């Protein structure tokens, strides 16, 4: 079925040239607040993920020394879906033409790769863990997205933006890691445990946290993060910067007692 075009709910802007670890941290925290529909023990929860209604997005406008690129991110799941080159007007969408799902961004040109990290890494010809994530990398990403038509450069730059904004918004440890190392002159890599233990589990962790909160009969399965056993949903919640709200978590709880 043809999907509907995404409506943009708000736009946030960030100048990469003057970015510091502190202003980056503040930006991520403000972004979480802008996205929140409610809070669970102080942690923002995203709007209900809805596949029937018109998809909602937000734009992130990034500038560096006069160069501009705007990326469009799906609000319900924080997946980067497209971007706009400098002065081009036309949007480029992360979707292979062969998927036949239609355009999430109206009038967009479909790229040769989809939004998953597997497809992005294949197009970039580089592993997620081999890419650098710091201020230099972000400046380079903005410059490349503003003007480059090279698939490898585009894909690598989109990975940098997705990690440093989408993943950092999802996870406290990832935001802290990027903030602490932002101004490093050496390449800054993503630790493997953050990819394996956190990033690959955000949807599942979100579900477990909200289900535990809504359903007294839900049995929480202990999780392992960085070698530590996490025994409760409240403990797991501490790792999340924002929680995805899946419709399944709102099913009526069992009859307790």
Swiss-Prot record:
UniProt entry tagged with the keyword Hydrolase: yes
Enzyme class: hydrolase
MF annotations from Gene Ontology: rRNA N-glycosylase activity; toxin activity
EC number(s) recorded for this UniProt protein: 3.2.2.22
InterPro entries, A to Z: Ribosome-inact_prot_sf, Ribosome_inactivat_1/2, Ribosome_inactivat_prot, Ribosome_inactivat_prot_sub1, Ribosome_inactivat_prot_sub2
Phylogenetic classification of the source organism: Eukaryota, Viridiplantae, Streptophyta, Embryophyta, Tracheophyta
Function: Inhibits translation in rabbit reticulocytes.
Family assignment from sequence similarity: Belongs to the ribosome-inactivating protein family. Type 1 RIP subfamily.
Organism encoding this protein: Drimia maritima (Sea squill)
Xref: Pfam families: RIP (PF00161)
Highest rank taxon of the organism: Eukaryota
Protein name: Ribosome-inactivating protein charybdin
Disulfide-bond pairs as recorded: 217-254
